[in-house]
């Protein structure tokens, strides 16, 4: 049988990065080679040469793998500006592929502060609003920092603790500590900023079991926060939140309990179980383990570790399942919906076996196109991050221009920023490597600067704050 005829030769990743001159890019340039039947060609030789910028490549030539992909790393030259590398396919007449990167003289992301967190497991999510950072410090509880609010004279480069609180044992979960996430509620009618909702993430088993309650903390006096109410579901534990503040409804991902909607209008005290509006398990009783939830475009979107991405109706419309798309090859993690697109991360605490028998880590970002009805349609190409095992947090900047990913479980852990000018073709902008990776990250704008508040955990837990103003311009 004659060898396949090499026909397709295209770039599939790495172009359009932005990095400091003289450094090696974090994402390799990658080409794809296919035959006349559009099937990948293995064993093809691809030659790489620097075309502009006086940089270097990690190899003069590489060979395509079973998927038809060949890659090389580019070390930038010393000058700022555009730097390019050309890829040529063996003796083929295929047009060479050119990759371009912008070299800059200073880092597009710079660390401005690091706040040590007690190693009582450490730090999980951080919620930032109005110059206050609400740090979920697991068994230590909630720690509130002034990072620009003014009550303690703190700033992003010099956070100052305002107060802390360790909630009591959960009335349903029976657990103490394990404070995982927070949301500071701004009342749309009264203007009150009275309540912070806290989520408790207890032990669990993917697909079948979890524990953890929701706590309500009154922060009318920021210096002396008080626990005033709680909510729990027997046999299930909460994970991430989203608030429809206009409707005064808290939506909570509840792992094997699915998604719940809670009425949080008025004064909150005691047991809030009577305020449950609706509950739905998107994948059914035996296939639901919901990680995250978000209200967007008049729907509720839920990312489920076992089944994928779901569209639900709002609580006011009964919160039923409207549509969904399954992700069977990896465990799904966080989500973010922006305009007509959605993005979901993947978790790699344990590998997941796909239909071919391959065990896959959680190193993929899944992109979704939302139909006019809001129903998600999975796009064929995922973003694969080499050197990480989990894409743990996903967020889009307030202006919709940048996508933030945090990653861990591998040598390339940290955070990554991508340009969303064309959501179908993400363009790498910047990354920051952090030993041990970053578990969570969120955007904030304080004093005219764009920031990322990230959690390094466990090992040497810390709240790490980066100025990414240059990367968001």
Which role fits each region the language model picked out?
Residues 1-106:
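The feature marks long extracellular or luminal low-complexity segments
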